Amino acid sequence: MRWLKCLNNGLVSLSSYKHLFNMNIAESGAVGDAITVHDFSEKILEQTVHFHVIKLNGGFFLWVGSNPVLSNLAVSMESKFDSMPLSTLVLGDPSDTTPNSLAQRLTKRTKKQVYVSYGLPMTDSNLSLLVENRIKKEMEVHPDKF
């Protein structure tokens, strides 16, 4: 069995790695579907918001923020038992439901597994709505990036 070395010098099996990111990796090490990266920015309510999308096979990772910090990471996926996608907060402040809600709505829209890291302050409720509208606009213009 092939093993991949982790950043923390631990070992994880190739099959575990494939399952974690739902990727299609051949035993030779070649990637079936390429991982792509897409970046865009927008000035929203006098604040520059950056978006970073990493497209995976069967899903994508979306980072939203104004500072380069990974925070409030949520994951969402479809459920065969409920029309509302499942979601959980992996990292961050449990009182901030924005990443969970955004991940759920993106999963419902795309039918994909979605990871969302949302690093914007909860100071203005309009900000999260405008951010989500900007993401939807980008998805319409560049559907192949998500």
PLM feature segments, named:
Residues T107-M139:
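Short, compact, well-ordered microdomains
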Residues L70-K111:
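Short, internal acidic amphipathic alpha-helical interface segments
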